[in-house]
Design a protein with these regions (language model features):
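Cleavable N-terminal signal peptides of Sec/SRP-targeted secreted and luminal proteins
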Residues: 2-18
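Inhibitory N-terminal propeptides of secreted protease zymogens
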Residues: 19-139
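N-terminal domain-start motif of subtilase-like serine proteases
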Residues: 19-34, 97-99, 109-116, 139-182, ...
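Subtilisin-like serine protease catalytic core
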Residues: 34-35, 152, 164-202, 211-257, ...
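Solvent-exposed loop/turn segments at secondary-structure junctions
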Residues: 46-50, 102-104, 114, 131-135, ...
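Sec/Tat-exported extracytoplasmic proteins
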Residues: 74, 89-93, 119-122, 128-131, ...
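Hydrolase catalytic cores
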Residues: 225, 243-248, 370-443
């Protein structure tokens, strides 16, 4: 009955075409049957492909100029593409935010009436709900006050992080600062392991609340950031400067927040959204989140494409839907470094998602320690906790990548990936398992990918000119 009422409302507005139009997502129709308003995302026909191709085909004197040109071109593209709709919305009381990184427009608390009107614009090709795509359960593991030892945690020893950093400092006289961004629940900026490596200005953005300083009401983001750049034996590369965007408000992540964070990564602003400075963009971005992957799941593809053009290395957790084959999550399943999780004994963690992807692509790309990993807790400045998940494995991938970029900051994505693959350790606990027609004793495979990360071996492959 409620769906019939919804259609009647549209008809009374004179919008029969909108009712029948495939522009309006079926899920959005169902949402309006339950609630009178909802946040929506509008997709425009122009898209970003032409801009990305143009920027990719041109040469720029340096990365900063590339990023500025990319962000400017995408912004102008969205203004031209969306001008009629933006002008229309300006005559209403609805709040909107342009997503130039994907040529989309977010509208807050949209109504049935508004959707019917928006669907009539010929340049609009799709209108869908700004869904909550991923949820975090709040960490419940015990809180530890202080660390029992200043020595590196077992997971850092596994990936030979300290040895790699020592080698890096022995062979490099002018090591550049590497900026690493997390898109997560935030970070406790005052934590003893993290306060010294925070980038500071241009290091934080909260799309929802526009909070001034990094914060974390969940703990997931603090933990993963600690594994990347934490001091005191918990971080893979503590010399990195961390940045963070709050793509997940407390226990959930919306499409808008994640896309908006992806846009901020390309050209960071101050926390209030002002004074963009593309030169502050991170060199890599760590994403410890994943959603179910179907052929229709493409909503983050354009963000990843833009990152590649802007020379931002994307690292993703592969998902926690194992142990069955074909369970890899999105976006770790596309053209990114997708990281699975291993245990203290170098077996695959039972929760770690396994490939192949639904398109037959080999995934995960690599694996890293992800079970029983100790890192910073959000509950106190000297508190820690142990967590498990591919969320914990992903920041190892980011940390190792940061070490490699510190050796050669201008490396391409493909060369970074080649170094990770070349150095990966294949002396792992296999079981003869077959996924996608590949047994796990043959590398690469769909269980371990190319192997478990080894920062030292990967760095040595670069220094020795093996790749």
């Amino acid at each position: 009955m409620s769906q019939i009422l919804f259609l009647i409302v549209l008809l009374t507005l004179g919008s029969t075409q909108a009712t029948l139009s495939p522009k309006i997502s079926p899920n959005l129709v169902l949402k309006f049957n339950q609630d009178p308003t909802t946040n929506i995302i509008i997709t425009f026909a122009t898209g970003t492909s032409a801009v990305l191709s143009y920027i990719s085909e041109n040469d720029f004197p340096d990365r900063d100029t590339l990023l500025f040109s990319l962000a400017t071109a995408l912004d102008i593209n969205s203004v031209q593409s969306q001008s009629s709709v933006r002008n229309f919305l300006a005559t209403t009381n609805f709040t909107s935010d342009p997503l130039w990184v994907t040529d989309q427009l977010w509208v807050k608390d949209s109504t049935v009436e508004l959707v019917s009107q928006l669907a009539e614009f010929p340049e609009v090709i799709e209108i869908f709900e700004d869904e909550l795509t991923f949820s975090f359960s709040e960490p419940s593991s015990p809180i530890l006050t202080g660390r029992s030892s200043p020595l590196a945690e077992w997971n850092l020893e596994k990936v030979k992080a300290e040895e790699a950093v020592t080698l890096l400092k022995n062979v490099s006289t002018n090591i550049p600062t590497i900026r690493v961004c997390t898109i997560d629940t935030g970070v406790r900026v005052t934590h003893e392991s993290l306060r010294g490596s925070y980038l500071g200005e241009y290091g934080w953005f909260d799309p929802g609340l526009r909070s001034d300083l990094p914060n974390d009401m969940n703990g997931h983001g603090t933990h993963v950031t600690g594994t990347i750049a934490g001091l005191g034996g918990i971080g893979v590369y503590p010399d990195a400067k961390w940045m963070s965007c709050k793509g997940c408000a407390t226990n959930f992540c919306s499409m808008y927040d994640l896309i908006r964070c992806g846009q901020w990564v390309l050209c960071p602003s101050l926390p209030n959204g002002s004074r963009r400075d593309c030169s502050k963009a991170p060199h890599l971005v760590s994403n410890s989140w994943a959603v179910a992957y179907t052929p229709e799941t493409t909503w983050f593809d354009d963000v990843v494409r833009a990152w590649h053009v802007g020379r931002v290395v994307p690292v993703f957790g592969i998902g926690n839907d194992g142990p069955n084959c074909g369970t890899v999550g999105y976006p770790g399943s596309i053209d990114v470094i997708g990281v699975g999780a291993t245990t203290t004994t170098d077996a695959i963690a039972p929760f770690s998602s396994v490939g192949p992807s639904i398109h037959g692509v080999l995934k995960p790309d690599v694996t890293a320690p992800g079970q029983n990993v100790l890192s910073a807790a959000h509950t106190g400045d000297n508190e820690y906790r142990v967590l498990s998940g591919t969320s914990m494995a992903c920041p190892h991938g980011a940390g190792v990548t940061a070490i490699l970029l510190a050796y050669n900051q201008t490396m391409s994505y493909d060369r970074v990936v080649e170094a990770l693959f070349t150095g990966a350790d294949t002396n792992l606990v296999t079981t003869g398992r077959v996924c996608g027609g590949v047994i796990d004793t043959t590398f690469p495979n769909h269980v371990f990918g190319h192997g478990r990360l080894d920062a030292l071996a990967s760095l040595e492959s670069l220094i020795g000119g093996k790749i």
